Amino acid sequence: EQGFQNAVAGASEAIVVTTPEMSAIRDADRIIGLLESKEEIKSYKLLLNRVRPSLIKSNEMMGVDDVVEILSCPLVGIIPEDTGIITSTNKGEPIVNDENALAGKAYRNVAQRILGEEVPFLDLDEPKGFMAKIKNAFAKLKAKV
């Protein structure tokens, strides 16, 4: 707890970063409880990291809405799991500099939200390739018929 006290000393706002795993969510819930007990902390938000939509779809990972409901904390961002982060870190280059990286875009959006801008959350289920986009468009068209 002393480490927590040192970390929040002088802070008036906080961002709780967690992953959609039960042990991490329990830890985040404990941190939120500690933040709520600090008069100096006027607001706090949740940043959900390492989100994998495929695992959410297969019910192997908790969904974003479920985590937000459990923690009762406003969401500031969703960062998808991205192997490009490992590569960029090893090169010493921030992922936010990669215009094509979904995680980089997600981090840029978080920064904009922190600055008070209204930015929609990324659709992490978006098809990646050209053919996938065409198939998705036809599937949507077929669903309307």
Give, region by region, the residue ranges found by the protein language model.
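Conserved catalytic-core segment of NTP-binding enzymes
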Residues: 1-77, 81, 86-87
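Alpha-helical scaffold segments in soluble metabolic enzymes
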Residues: 6, 30, 106-109, 113
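Alpha-helical structural motif
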Residues: 81, 103-106, 130
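C-terminal boundary of histidine-terminating zinc-finger modules
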Residues: 91-106
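A short, charged, Gly/Pro-tolerant segment at domain boundaries
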Residues: 109, 113, 122-145
